[in-house]
């Protein structure tokens, strides 16, 4: 990325929507080193505010000035502002929730390794786990019939026969693992 930032004569935008769940460092500390760097983040993931549709853009003063000139006036409504402020005042709570999700993600991945029809568990720095299975549509429908909602990603590019499991609470993850184990036995 640094090579691109140094050589590319244009903007380089880094989407850090899931940065709070990642072991990677944010690019924010390098923002002043690269005038063409733009970093976007969201309050949808770690902060759990997907419904308010609020993101943050970090960039040089020059880029922010251009963005301010082209954005609509009053583009963030008062209710969104209030909800964002309320949640931002609970940063320690959010950090604890993220830490819990990261721990649950590790546990979930460990347990998924024993499911026979899971062919690949992809590395993740998110609040979900992407897996390749023997037959995504079949497994998706079986899980739905057990009352478990997952995402069938088989129609997405490079995700043929993949399911996406959102990392839940310990109880939710155990329910998922139990259902997967039952399906593995019954095949």
Give each language-model segment a name.
Residues 1-12, 16-46:
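Active-site pre-lysine segment of PLP-dependent enzymes
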Residues 31, 112-113, 143, 180:
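Hydrophobic C-terminal alpha-helix "anchor/cap" residues
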Residues 36-114, 120-121:
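PLP-dependent aminotransferase class I/II
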Residues 51, 125-126, 157-161:
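Short acidic/glycine-enriched loop/turn segments that link adjacent beta-strands
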Residues 59, 131-134, 167-169:
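Short beta-strand-to-loop capping motifs
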Residues 101-102, 115-146:
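Conserved PLP-binding catalytic core of the aspartate aminotransferase-like
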Residues 145-146, 156-187:
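PLP-dependent enzyme catalytic core of the Aspartate aminotransferase-like
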């Amino acid at each position: 990325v640094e090579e691109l930032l140094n050589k590319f004569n244009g903007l380089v935008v880094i989407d850090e929507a899931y940065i709070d769940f990642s072991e990677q460092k944010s690019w924010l500390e390098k923002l002043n080193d690269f005038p063409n760097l733009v970093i976007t983040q969201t309050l949808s993931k770690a902060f759990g505010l997907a419904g308010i549709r609020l993101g943050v853009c970090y960039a040089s003063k020059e880029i922010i000035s251009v963005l301010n000139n082209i954005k609509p006036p009053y583009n963030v409504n008062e209710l969104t502002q209030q909800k964002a402020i309320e949640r931002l005042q609970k940063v320690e709570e959010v950090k604890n929730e993220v830490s819990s999700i990261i721990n649950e993600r590790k546990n979930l991945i460990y347990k998924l390794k024993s499911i026979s029809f899971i062919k690949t568990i992809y590395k993740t720095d998110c609040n979900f786990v992407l897996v390749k299975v023997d037959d995504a549509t079949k497994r998706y429908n079986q899980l739905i019939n057990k009352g478990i909602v997952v995402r069938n990603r088989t129609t997405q590019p490079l995700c043929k026969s993949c399911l996406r499991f959102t990392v839940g609470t310990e109880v939710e993850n155990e329910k998922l693992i139990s259902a997967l184990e039952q399906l593995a036995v019954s095949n």
